[in-house]
Every structure is written in structure tokens, then in C-alpha cells.
Amino acid sequence: MLNYFFKKKSKLLKSTNFQYVFSNPCNKNTFHINILGRSNLLGHPRLGLSISRKNIKHAYRRNKIKRLIRETFRLLQHRLISMDFVVIAKKNIVYLNNKKIVNILEYIWSNYQR
């Protein structure tokens, strides 16, 4: 049975982990979201978020976007290849509703599936 938890081992926590991804990333871009990925040797995917106050002014909007990103990752983590991902949200994502954001994320995650 699959485990759909989003545990600490599935998160990028340290700046060295983020720098590892930023040093040689594999990019997948849309007009609203940019996902950087780099393979790891851990055997499972990990997620890091970079949602800046400069791009998205209000905290409740940043938190909503982070929740949606984590939720789509949590549900699809068993299909993803073993990579470290950093998700960067762009300014114009605030104009989308939740359903469109989820559809965009699922489309991008499908590029990284096994």
C-alpha cells in the first residue's frame, strides 16, 4: 500500500541542498511556475519551495500556493523519478484559481514521471 505522507525526508531543508539543484538544473517552465530539478541518489524525490515576497506580496496568497504545490507533490511523489526539485512561483500566478494552478502543476510533474 502506498504511503501518501509528506515527511521531512521529502523536503529540501538546507541551503546546500538548494545550491545543489541551482548549480546544474533541469528546467521545466510555464508562464506561471518554474520547476528546477536535479537527480539525487536517495531513491526518492524531494521538494523545495522558493516563493518570494517580492513576487507575491500577501502572505495568505504565498501560503495558498505553497499548500497547492506540496499537495500535488505529495499525491504524485510515488510516480516521480528520484530528483531534488525546487519550485519557483512567478508574479502572475496570483491571478489563477486553485484548479488552474493544480492543473499546471500536474502537467509539469508529468514531465518528471517514471
Curated annotation (Swiss-Prot):
Q: Which domain of life is it from?
A: Bacteria
Q: What is this protein called?
A: Ribonuclease P protein component
Q: How does it assemble?
A: Consists of a catalytic RNA component (M1 or rnpB) and a protein subunit.
Source species: Buchnera aphidicola subsp. Schizaphis graminum (strain Sg)
**Which HAMAP family does the record associate with it?**
RNase_P (MF_00227)
Entry EC number(s): 3.1.26.5
The major lineage groups are: Bacteria, Pseudomonadati, Pseudomonadota, Gammaproteobacteria, Enterobacterales
Q: Name one GO biological process term.
A: tRNA 5'-leader removal
Function summary: RNaseP catalyzes the removal of the 5'-leader sequence from pre-tRNA to produce the mature 5'-terminus. It can also cleave other RNA substrates such as 4.5S RNA. The protein component plays an auxiliary but essential role in vivo by binding to the 5'-leader sequence and broadening the substrate specificity of the ribozyme.
- InterPro entries in the record: Ribosomal_Su5_D2-typ_SF (IPR020568), Ribsml_uS5_D2-typ_fold_subgr (IPR014721), RNase_P (IPR000100), RNase_P_CS (IPR020539)
Per the UniProt entry, the signal peptide is none
Name the protein family.
Answer: Belongs to the RnpA family.
Q: Name one GO cellular component term.
A: ribonuclease P complex
Which molecular function term from Gene Ontology is one that the record holds? Answer: tRNA binding
**Gene it is expressed from:** rnpA
Q: Which reaction does it catalyse?
A: Endonucleolytic cleavage of RNA, removing 5'-extranucleotides from tRNA precursor
Q: Does the keyword Transmembrane helix apply?
A: no
